[in-house]
From Swiss-Prot:
It comes from Emericella nidulans (strain FGSC A4 / ATCC 38163 / CBS 112.46 / NRRL 194 / M139). Residues 28-56, 182-213 are annotated as: Disordered. One of its GO terms (biological process) is mitochondrial electron transport, NADH to ubiquinone. This is Lactobacillus shifted protein. One of its GO terms (cellular component) is respiratory chain complex I. InterPro entries: Znf_CHCC. Residues 28-38 have a biased composition (Polar residues). Migration on a 2D-gel is shifted by co-cultivation with L.plantarum. PANTHER family: NADH DEHYDROGENASE [UBIQUINONE] IRON-SULFUR PROTEIN 6, MITOCHONDRIAL, NADH-UBIQUINONE OXIDOREDUCTASE 13 KD-A SUBUNIT.
Length: 213
C-alpha cells in the first residue's frame, strides 16, 4: 500500500528539482549592442523646438526680460554637446540632441539650461611635463578635485597623457626627437596661455614626484 505513495512523492519531488535546475541566475544576459546597425536610408533629424518659444512670455520675476528664443538658436543649443564642441568626445557619452528631446523640451528656453564647457580642448593647451624618471605618478593635484594616483610609463618616445586628467608627460631623453616631429598634440614648451597650470602648483600637501605640475 505504501509503494504507490512513495513513487508519487518521488515523481513530484523530481519534477520540482528539474524545474528549479532549468533556471539559473548565472546565465549571461545579452548586453546592449554599442555598435548600431547601418541604416542605408537614415531619417532626417526633426527639430524638437516649438515655435511658441519665439513668443515673449513673462518670466514672473525670475528674469528682468521676457522669456523668448528663436527656433534656430534653440535648436543649435540643443544639438551642441557643449558650447565649444559640437559632437561627443568620449565613448560613454550620449549625444545631447538625443537626451534633450521629446515633449518635455519642446517649450524650454535652451540658452537658460546648464551647458558646461568641454575641457577636452583646454587640456590640450597644457605644456608637456618633461621628466627624468621612466615611471611617474599623477593624482590630478589631490584633494577633492584630484583623482586616484596612477603611474605612467614614459620610456617610449611619445607624449603620454594621464588617463584621468589628461596632463601630458614625456621623458627628457626624447625631447629632441619629439621636437623634430612636424606636429604635436600638446605644446612642448609653455606658451603663456591663460589656461596653463603652473608646474610648481601643489595641491597635495607634502607631495613628491609629479602629482600636479
Amino acid at each position: 500500500m505504501l509503494l504507490p505513495t512513495v513513487r508519487s512523492r518521488i515523481a513530484a519531488l523530481s519534477s520540482r528539482v528539474a524545474s528549479r535546475a532549468a533556471y539559473s541566475t548565472t546565465v549571461p544576459r545579452f548586453t546592449e549592442n554599442a555598435m548600431q546597425p547601418n541604416d542605408p536610408t537614415p531619417r532626417p533629424a526633426k527639430p524638437n523646438v516649438s515655435e511658441t518659444d519665439a513668443t515673449p512670455v513673462d518670466s514672473m520675476g525670475a528674469w528682468d526680460a521676457a522669456l523668448q528664443e528663436s527656433t534656430d538658436a534653440a535648436e543649435r543649443v540643443r544639438t551642441m554637446q557643449a558650447p565649444n564642441r559640437k559632437g561627443t568626445w568620449a565613448s560613454n557619452q550620449k549625444p545631447r540632441a538625443e537626451a534633450m528631446s521629446g515633449p518635455r523640451f519642446e517649450q524650454t528656453i535652451m540658452h537658460l539650461q546648464p551647458t558646461p564647457m568641454a575641457a577636452i580642448e583646454l587640456i590640450h593647451k597644457q605644456p608637456v611635463r618633461w621628466v627624468k624618471d621612466k615611471i611617474v605618478s599623477c593624482d590630478g593635484g589631490g584633494g577633492p578635485l584630484g583623482h586616484p594616483r596612477i603611474f605612467i610609463n614614459t620610456d617610449k618616445p611619445e607624449i603620454v597623457p594621464c588617463g584621468y586628467c589628461g596632463l601630458p608627460f614625456a621623458h627628457e631623453h626624447h625631447r629632441e626627437y619629439l621636437k623634430s616631429l612636424p606636429t604635436s598634440s600638446y605644446p612642448l614648451e609653455p606658451t603663456g596661455a591663460a589656461e596653463e597650470v603652473n608646474e610648481n602648483q601643489r595641491v597635495t600637501e607634502g607631495a613628491t614626484g609629479y602629482e600636479q605640475r
